[in-house]
């Protein structure tokens, strides 16, 4: 189903007929075919993305294998990257986007305080969905929900443990599932730009 719909999008961009001789995308945009990104949790999805020369999008978190709730995210995603790179046609430059949860505050204690309600809510949702979450502290949740939270020093140290970031061509940050105020979100963006970004490039 996914492949069929992706093919339809390609056809539309080329300006092909869409279900009726008079239906065409105007203006056609065939150049968009070189800008497709595919999000996947699996090696199989990464292989398909690589074979097609698409970009690979990696999630900020993803389910752990049964019995391994504390398996690091990069241990799951590095094999996905390996499969993608192996499948890329010769001469096609890799495009790998790693999305990550990061909330940065001037005070480490303040960051944890702001993060706790949202992380507890996400942990409860994971458990209700049948996923195993160990422990009940903010520290437990940070590791298992892949959230990088704290003052700049702590977040830099946390991100440094994620080997996927060194392999990514693009990195994006979001505050979800932390639920900060608008002001705290803007301050986090500012701190990421000033203190975090220089350390991950």
Where on the chain are the PLM-derived regions?
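Active-site-adjacent structural elements that line small-molecule/cofactor binding pockets in enzymes
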Residues: 1-201
């Amino acid at each position: 189903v996914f492949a069929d719909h992706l093919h339809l999008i390609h056809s539309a961009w080329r300006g092909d007929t869409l279900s009726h001789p008079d239906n065409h995308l105007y203006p056609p945009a065939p150049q968009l075919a070189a800008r497709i990104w595919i999000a996947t949790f699996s090696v199989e999805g990464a292989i398909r993305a690589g074979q097609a020369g698409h970009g690979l999008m990696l999630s900020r978190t993803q389910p752990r294998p049964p019995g391994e709730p504390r398996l690091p995210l990069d241990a799951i995603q590095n094999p996905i990257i390996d499969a993608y790179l192996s499948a890329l046609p010769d001469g096609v430059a890799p495009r790998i986007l790693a999305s990550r949860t990061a909330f940065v505050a001037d005070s480490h204690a303040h960051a944890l305080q702001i993060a706790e309600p949202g992380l507890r809510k996400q942990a409860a949702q994971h458990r209700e969905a049948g996923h195993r979450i160990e422990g009940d502290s903010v520290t437990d949740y940070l590791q298992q929900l892949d959230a990088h939270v704290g003052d700049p020093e702590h977040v830099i140290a946390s991100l440094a443990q994620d080997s996927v970031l060194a392999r990514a061509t693009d990195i994006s940050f979001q505050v979800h599932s932390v639920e900060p105020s608008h002001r705290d979100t803007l301050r986090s963006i500012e701190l990421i730009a000033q203190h975090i970004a220089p350390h991950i490039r």
